[in-house]
Amino acid sequence: TEGQTVHYSLPYGYWMLGFTASNSQYHQSVAGFNGPISYAGKSNNAEVKLSRLVYRDQSRKTTVVLKGFRRESRNVIEDTELPDQHRVVGGWEFSLNHREFIGDATLDGTLAYKRGTGGFGARPAAEEIAFGNGASPFLEGTSRLKLYTAEVSLNAPFKLGEEKLRYSGLVRAQWNRTPLTPQDRFAIGGRYTVRGFDGETSLMGE
């Protein structure tokens, strides 16, 4: 697995314009009946973000952010691309970000609305194509997503005897107004983030 990221920010007064582009590739061999099967994939992501600091004092600050995004992913088996797994999503996101300093602790909160528009070369999701571009009530995902998200995190240092420790907590929620593709659903994580989880199966939800 390998990846690269490029980021550039241009501040102007209370405004900030930023651009981020990244890509990653991975390759793995899976055991098959007639020998190892080569499975590979790659992804490309880009976003342009405009933010504005709307309030700030010595204990808190609030920022509004508008960004346009494009993300693409594809997978291949034995050098043959899987058409159903070639996904391109483009759209915009508006968010309200707040940071509160409470003593030595930092509390962050974000409310956001993400909208897939079909722009930036987006492709209909495989789920849309299978059900006539959204004509079926059993549609399981769309590239024109409508998604609300909320996130709160707390980072607080503390001492236990002579030991200096730090608490980090994160709560995340989302509310979908459209069926979501796997890339936008919640997942339990992987073998490196959940103890005792082998990664062979996954638990996902919208």
Label for each model-derived stretch:
Residues 76-206:
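C-terminal outer-membrane beta-barrel translocator/porin domains of Gram-negative envelope proteins
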Residues 1-105:
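Gram-negative/organellar outer-membrane beta-barrel architecture
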